[in-house]
Amino acid sequence: MALALLALLLVPALRQWLTASMWRHMVLQFPLWMLAGAWLVAGLPPAARAHVARWNAHGISGLVGTGTVLAVLMVPRVLDLALVSLPIEAAKCAALLLAGAALRLSWRAAGLVVQGFFLGNMLPMMAVVGQLYIDSPLRLCNAYLLDDQARLGAWLVTAAAALAVGWLVKVVWWVVRRDVLVEQQVAQAAQATEKAKAGVASNAHDPATIN
């Protein structure tokens, strides 16, 4: 699946279509390259995952790397250069591939606290950049028109809000599920205690046990 997606992304016609629009360039092409990276590392053997985990405690290193890549690639000048320079385009795609792999290997290990810290930095940055694209009276990217720039800004603000809501829903679901499991465990422990007490009382009144 990962190799098929990579092959598709390397098709010149698709690449040209994705980069012809500023919002498709950032909102579609970026996530697709990251998805390919995530799929590539999905089948890593346990030994390789353990080796990566040595320098990626709690997913911090991977998430910092992912955040750095995305922050750099949101700079308008980088988008312009990627369109006219093949080495920079290749570096951009490789960085997104690695960012997707790092995100896949780091997200679950990070836990809710580190995830919240990561999203608490990335999502406001996305929203601020998006609002700047919307409000700017000047073209920030020479290769794209002003209305396309504003459209990208709207997409970034919407995506940041949607990701924030989605993660908060996940947190609420996890907390509710944890509380339900705790209540079930407490109820099971209480039932086991009652059964044990009933067994002791039954043995105490059993003549054969008394004798």
Could you tell me what each predicted segment is?
Residues 1-211:
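Alpha-helical membrane segments of multi-pass proteins
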